[in-house]
């Protein structure tokens, strides 16, 4: 299926809002613009295959002692900005006829000149043969839509500097009148002082193509900012309700269980990994994970235990926020694909090679093209504002017994353990940290290593676990006392 149809179908099936559709990459309109670029190039005699050969020839090996490339004919498509702060793209096709290399015989130069004669004959259309400024050819459409060639000197319309290093004494183009003078003589018999001729060609439709694409990226930037602001507001509302609900112990445990299922489903990220530069999940993966979360949530039966109206409303808002973010990511994905496809089609139709140069040139101009992904930034806010509001037991578990680390001892290396496990290790003459192996970390631990802040948090948010931990500790102590009591000699009645 053609991508244009796929794009239309996706926007319809995903129920994308109309204002989003209007801000999307207008793939069909850009395709029509590319066709006009092709027509203009062919109008100038620069067919796709011809340009492909010339553009491929622009990369040459240059020895350290050489100042001139060895290609006698070079074509280069240059994209630049109109100014440092501007976002507008100025495209220009540069054709260089370089006869300065001694590696090419006169016959070879004549052969190359004949091949290019018909292509550039219409470009060199100025009767003034005296000035020695570089030639700029610009295409314009007249009122009837027909193409016209407009020529100018470098002083009136300066081309951008070439990306290739120019020779120290590069001569300028000798301009000839293609209708009234002998172009063969000008092209095929370059004199000793003018061995490098440069022509800058400004098309009409490629400028419109980049202007249209830039406008659409601006629209996507605006939409992204608007939707990001909406989601952040949704997150704030949910965070406010969750903060209120966590004060009630019964609701606290329900929401902790709900968030545990959410984290285990890894909808957008792995817990505590949103700030890592890991590869972003595709929108298909996210949708699958979100569906998995809903399935696991139904299996757990958590929702049947939600009795308070506020809890149900907050949960519904939480789900709406997730699906809102998913829809934005799906929209971003299809637009990223549309941008990639349209740049690829531009190159396929014209051989001008913008797939790498254009994104690099505008990478800092658009939110859509730069910075961390929307999913990563929003998910970080979700984690910090909502998920971490209700602490997870895994964050306060002892790595040795895997139960809550009460009473918590923080060793000098920073790792947290329950005091009971550390006492056992010390009794077994194990004095290094079990995780990082820091020597004598357990040996030198004392009452000052008791993490009072974590202990208060555990009592507040994990009252059931703390109570169970104390019960297990007392039971263990009782068993130890019995064991010690039974280890002595038994009384024997004679």
Curated annotation (Swiss-Prot):
Keyword Zinc-finger: yes
Keyword annotations: Cell adhesion, Metal-binding, Nucleus, Transcription, Transcription regulation, Zinc, Zinc-finger
Signal peptide: none
InterPro entries: SPX_dom, Znf_RING, Znf_RING/FYVE/PHD, Znf_RING_CS
GO cellular component: nucleus
Taxonomic superkingdom: Eukaryota
The UniProt record lists the keyword Membrane: no
Matches recorded under Gene3D superfamilies: Zinc/RING finger domain, C3HC4 (zinc finger)
SMART domains found in the cross-reference section: RING (SM00184)
Positions of the SPX domain: 1-360
Effect of gene knockout: Decreases cell adherence to silicone substrate.
Residue spans, zinc finger RING-type: 398-437
PANTHER family: RING FINGER PROTEIN 127, TRANSCRIPTIONAL REGULATOR OF YEAST FORM ADHERENCE 3
Purpose of the protein: Transcription factor required for yeast cell adherence to silicone substrate.
Protein's UniProt name: Transcriptional regulator of yeast form adherence 3
Organism from which the protein derives: Candida albicans (strain SC5314 / ATCC MYA-2876) (Yeast)
């Amino acid at each position: 299926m053609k991508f244009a149809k796929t794009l239309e179908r996706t926007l319809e099936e995903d129920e994308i809002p109309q204002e989003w559709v209007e801000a999307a990459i207008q793939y069909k309109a850009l395709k029509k613009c590319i066709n006009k670029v092709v027509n203009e190039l062919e109008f100038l005699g620069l067919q796709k295959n011809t340009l492909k050969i010339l553009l491929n020839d622009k990369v040459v090996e240059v020895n350290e002692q050489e100042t001139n490339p060895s290609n006698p004919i070079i074509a280069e498509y240059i994209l630049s900005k109109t100014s440092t702060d501007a976002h507008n793209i100025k495209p220009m096709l540069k054709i260089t006829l370089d006869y300065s290399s001694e590696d090419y015989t006169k016959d070879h130069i004549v052969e190359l000149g004949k091949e290019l004669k018909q292509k550039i004959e219409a470009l060199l259309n100025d009767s003034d043969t005296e000035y020695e400024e570089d030639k700029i050819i610009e295409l314009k459409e007249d009122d009837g839509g027909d193409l016209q060639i407009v020529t100018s000197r470098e002083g009136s319309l300066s081309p951008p500097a070439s990306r290739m290093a120019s020779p120290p004494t590069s001569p300028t183009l000798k301009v000839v009148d293609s209708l009234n003078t002998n172009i063969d003589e000008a092209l095929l018999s370059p004199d000793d002082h003018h061995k490098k001729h440069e022509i800058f060609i400004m098309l009409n439709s490629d400028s419109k193509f980049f202007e249209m694409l830039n406008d659409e990226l601006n629209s996507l930037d605006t939409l992204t900012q608007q939707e990001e602001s909406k989601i952040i507001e949704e997150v704030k509302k949910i965070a406010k309700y969750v903060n209120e609900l966590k004060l009630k112990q019964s609701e606290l445990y329900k929401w902790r269980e709900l968030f545990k299922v959410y984290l285990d489903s890894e909808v957008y990220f792995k817990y505590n990994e949103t700030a890592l530069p890991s590869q972003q999940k595709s929108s298909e993966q996210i949708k699958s994970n979100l569906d998995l979360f809903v399935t696991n949530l139904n299996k757990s039966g958590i929702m049947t235990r939600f009795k308070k109206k506020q809890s149900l409303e907050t949960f519904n808002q939480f789900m709406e926020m997730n699906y809102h973010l998913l829809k934005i990511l799906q929209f971003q994905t299809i637009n990223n694909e549309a941008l990639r496809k349209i740049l690829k089609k531009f190159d396929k139709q014209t051989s001008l090679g913008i797939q790498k140069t254009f994104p690099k040139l505008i990478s800092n101009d658009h939110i859509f093209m730069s910075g961390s992904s929307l999913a990563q930034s929003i998910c970080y806010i979700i984690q910090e504002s909502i998920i971490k509001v209700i602490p997870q037991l895994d964050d306060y578990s002892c790595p040795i017994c895997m139960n809550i680390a009460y009473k918590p001892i923080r060793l000098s290396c920073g790792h947290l353990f329950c005091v009971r496990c550390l006492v056992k290790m010390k009794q077994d003459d194990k004095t290094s940290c079990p995780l990082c192996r820091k020597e004598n970390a357990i040996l030198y631990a004392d009452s000052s290593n008791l993490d009072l802040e974590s202990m208060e948090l555990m009592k507040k948010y994990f009252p059931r676990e703390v109570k169970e931990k104390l019960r297990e500790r007392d039971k263990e102590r009782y068993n130890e006392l019995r064991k010690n009591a039974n280890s002595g000699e038994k009384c024997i009645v004679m």
